[in-house]
Amino acid sequence: MGYHIVNFLIHFLSAAFLFFAILYLLETPNLKEKFSKRRNFIAFLSATLWAIHPIQTQAVTYIVQRMASMAAMFYILSILCYIKCRMSGASLHRIFCLLGCVLTFLLALGSKENAAMLPASLLLIELTCYKKFNWRFSKKIYFWGSVVIGVIILILTVWFFSPDITFSWLNGYRNRPFTLTERILTEPRIVLFYLSQILFPLPNRLSVEHDVILSTSFFQPWTTLPAILLTLLLMGLGISQIRKRPIIALAVLFFFLNHIIESTVIPLELVFEHRNYLPSMFLFLPIATGFKWLYDYCAAKKQPLTGILFGLLVLLMVSLGIGTYTRNLAWATEVSLWRDAMKKAPQSARPLTILACQLYYGPAATSCLYNEALRIYENARTLSLK
């Protein structure tokens, strides 16, 4: 129980830091003219929708994924410190905020490696939220250019002197049932699947395990090429909206940017829902601002739809809350978790194997469950031999 309480506190702090980060983002030059009047409501709604969404269950309830939630907590706190640094006029306060930004970045990086994308996220915030991409434009260009060139030189140097070490991480594919090429081709479908889970978090679509058909070429399965093209289209849409609709650009590009480490070339498992914990942080911002715009429009026209809008909003939040509660019921015990996964990923041997072990050896094991455990294990063995 203590582990879950700490995880919940981390989640609560992450939501609070996200609230303040959005609150101050809406005070940046590109956004304050449109959104500063209702920024408290927008920030609260956006952070709340993120916090109560069922897809966050795995990152919060799964004790091992404290690394993901802690990384996200320090990550968003680092962004908050950066924004405060940009807003501050006093030199001492700016230095303090900048040190906080660096320290929390290191803490995020120490929690989980996907926090390495923070510099790119800060650059994205600069591009979307500030009219002039500078603190003296030329100096910033020189700085970021030097960073990129320095990283490239470092990678090339290490590769030149120790090519085996540089690409040793590729050896991980020896223990995976897929190749590097198959992973790269498959991941666009998975990232779009993540997006669909966030937009339509139906209970039967959320699981600790998912059946994944590997993409072996652009046309096998046929959804591979459309998924790649749609992913590129969404990223292109985000880039094209940097000036016109910066909130959409920030939400879309932040999502894809922070999936790069875990959803590209590194030989990790293909799909896990907790990987959306950090990338989804700004995805609900366009929804919140869209609701605010629609409400203001109806209020200006003196239409009775404002009450209906709030009713729909309450219905949405209650639905998400119920979905999260239902999802947590599946995580109540190891047996309930893997029974749930067995139903939702019937072609995967892992849920069957783990469930059989829990029924045979686990705390809930009884003599009457042995036969069921053996039957499930035989099914797992059959699937693994396919």
Q: What is the role of each PLM region?
A:
Residues 1-386:
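Polytopic membrane enzymes that build or remodel cell-surface glycoconjugates and lipids
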